[in-house]
Amino acid sequence: MLEADAARLKTDRLGYNPLHVLRADAATRRQEPAILTMIRSSPPMSVDSSPLPEALRHAASISRFMRRMLDSRPWLAAQLAGSLGQPLDSEAMSSFLANRGVDEARLRASLRHLRSWVVCHVLTRDLNGFADLAEVTETMTVLAEVTVRATYEVLREGLVARYGAPLSPTGWEQELLVIGMGKLGGRELNVSSDIDLIFVYPEDGDTGGNKVISNFEFFERLGKQMIQALADVTEHGQVFRVDMRLRPNGDSGPLVCSFDMLENYFITQGREWERYAWIKARVLAGERYHELEQIARPFVFRKYLDFGSINAMRALHAQIRREVTRRDRVNNIKLGPGGIREIEFTAQVFQLIRGGREPGLQVRATLDVLAVLGERGILTPQTVGELAEAYDFLRRLEHRLQYLDDAQTHDLPGNDEDCECIARAMDFPDYTSFLGVLDHHRAAVSRHFDHVFGDPSEEAHTLDSMWAAARDVEQAEPILSRLGYGDPSGAAHRLAALHGSARYQQLPNHIRSRLDALMPRVVEVAAATPGPDETLARCIDLIEAISRRGAYLALLQQYPQALRRVADLVGASRWAAQYLTRHPILLDELLDDRNLEPAPDWDALRAQMRDTLDTLEPDMERQMDVMREQHHAQVFRLLTQDIAGLLTVEKLADHLSALADLMLELALPLVWRKIKIRHRDDPAFAVIAYGKLGGKELGYASDLDIVFLFDDPAPEALEVYTRLAQRINTWLSSQTAAGILFETDLRLRPNGESGLLVTSIESFRKYQLESAWVWEHQALTRARFAAGDATIGAAFERIRCEVLRLPRDIAALRAEVLAMRRKMSDAHAGKSERFNLKHDAGGLVDVEFLIQYLVLGHAHRYPELTGNLGNIALLRIAGELGLIPAELAARCGDSYRLFRRLQHRQRLNGLLSLVAPDEVAAAREPVRALWTIVFGSA
């Protein structure tokens, strides 16, 4: 029952609770002992010879197959009487085979008797409310596994006796890997299903017996014998129909293939529908499944988001629907509108799109996939609940249709007697009531399917003709003018240049068709933004950058809301446009409304990323890419919130700084694991943040000022931690396929670029107390522990406070600070008449120097000044302490906040931190006044 219970728990997480599950659970708890007593007290009987126990009689009243089995197999009723009290597992089935005999002579009969027992057992439990859907599908899956493995072992033994074991060229014994596909692979097998199999073996070679044949011949013979043993219809019936059409090249391909052949097929010929089929692939027999997974996973789960899968799945489903309609089988609950296949497609298309980037989606069972999609917000809770409930209803109905005659059918019955049976089996008073609920579920499934797979490009757009003739600038200009473009001629020429470009002309036909469907909508959404001309130009830059990646075009084509958000974003910020162009994988972030929620859940992100990074071990390159992708995604989410006006500059900087801390925290243990000469489990090592990261004022493009400290007496500690620091720096700043994580600056360490890369905590203290320059103590005012060993972080904070609270000669300090300020001013002297927000007198640097001077000059008397509280808070404290006028301190804080906001605005638009002097004249005045009070000159 464990797996059935797990399935119920998953069902609960989906947010729905089908009545039959509750009913089955309650019935199981209340009635199983009574049922067992009733069955065991009755002698084994056929349907006609004497009254049957009620559980069997009820099942037989619905299932003609059950009646036939009881009549033709005198042993079956007694077998059922001993087993109905609990689900059947592999141990029970294997024991049955062992008792019947599974040598080659008795194999076929034993397998068929096993199936008769298992199917009658599960249908009786199901129809009497003792089994839920999870138990039925699990039992049938286990039956397939047991019979396939038994068949494989018995028949292989016979072939080995005749030809010897198949061997690789180096002498390793080879095995056949039997791969279960479809519902068998997903552990979702129905009661009258065929089984989809693929046969694969690791390496070519020859057998090692006296009569030598190739490995291919050996495994081909084994495969053929297995199919016959399972699928042949004998006087005892059949075990499973076997479908081999999912193998490479289908019916025209060889029955078995080697790993090399399979990999080559995936690379050169694998089609989208085969990716869909291989999602559920699972090895039933054979040990070398890890090697097979390494071959199949890159084919199924692409490294990047693959929205082109939607079109491929749409085409596949359209073909299936045409077949169903052509055969007048609209009542097919599997392939028809609103059927099981549409639920599976809706779930699995997101596996194809996102599975390569989100390992959590690399699961097989449909309900498990829906649960993950709901947890990650890819589908809404309502959608997940309705699809899961419909899936449960349709799969239970599917089983009841098949219980009638053990036929592989999915069509609703065509006669009144069977209609009445189905209604009763589904717990409805009549067939009309049943159809009402069925239609409700199918309508919900179709609605959700159409929402996911509806094709916006099929609808003609009013601007299609303009784009088709885009090179005719004179025709396009008046249309663009009416749409609201300020420079219709310029916009028309941009469109004409794109349409006539070699890049556009050389696109593959299917990608160019997507771009043709997209461009009229781009023109339309850009026109709706405040600056349509600039928005269109930036959108075209983005589209040119992604034009060869059909998946991104498909995303924008498939999701109009994403296209509108792109237009709003790039129209509002040149920097955002450039960031999105550099990292187009972030387009996916525009689909999730939760990304506009302004409070990142850092704990959840930390846990999720740790799990993901651990699963990728030891693939360092992929770990680096994942960290970059996640960092870019989080930055982009903050950017969308920022542009939407949901974040202040201060709150944005807090979030960006927290994100950087998290990346440092995650990187450190990953890098440490890869240090071969490490001498302890956890490094006695800490990362100290300086500058904007230290002060929690990080911007979108800020580099990280960091220093590395260690506290470890081991003789090899310096060498080990130097290597660790080097690797961390490389991890952060290396360019990979996903970009870089951060630019780093390590020059604030003791002795700067000429100093050691890592410093012991004792040496750091000695340096700060005896050798550091005043400007290094200024930098220390904004430093803090960021990642690593918290004990070292606490020791650093004690040293920082000790140094900052040293009594200083105030005159000498003033002279040093002023000299450093003049040096910085000279280095950034510009000829612009515009005001430099950072470096000009009365700007940001002046405020920072004022605060640093006040801290260094007075912290020995007022230790509260050493808190890493931010510049505005420190100004307020200095005012409250009477070190500066409180009213002037507050005005300087307001000025500092304004300067940062203006600087942020400029950077979002890709501009230097230069503004018109009149815009900041009032804000400069209190800063210059405070400078005069503190330093004696403006």
From Swiss-Prot:
State whether keyword Nucleotidyltransferase applies: yes
Signal peptide location: none
Determine the domain of life of the protein's source: Bacteria
Spell out the molecular function terms from Gene Ontology. Answer: [glutamate-ammonia-ligase] adenylyltransferase activity; [glutamine synthetase]-adenylyl-L-tyrosine phosphorylase activity; ATP binding; magnesium ion binding
Q: Which UniProt keywords apply?
A: ATP-binding, Magnesium, Multifunctional enzyme, Nucleotide-binding, Nucleotidyltransferase, Transferase
Q: Which reaction does it catalyse?
A: [glutamine synthetase]-O(4)-(5'-adenylyl)-L-tyrosine + phosphate = [glutamine synthetase]-L-tyrosine + ADP; [glutamine synthetase]-L-tyrosine + ATP = [glutamine synthetase]-O(4)-(5'-adenylyl)-L-tyrosine + diphosphate
Query: Which GO biological-process labels does this protein carry?
Result: regulation of glutamine family amino acid metabolic process
Which EC number(s) does the record attach to this protein? 2.7.7.89, 2.7.7.42
> Would you identify the family this protein belongs to, as annotated?
Belongs to the GlnE family.
What is the protein name given in its UniProt record? Answer: Bifunctional glutamine synthetase adenylyltransferase/adenylyl-removing enzyme
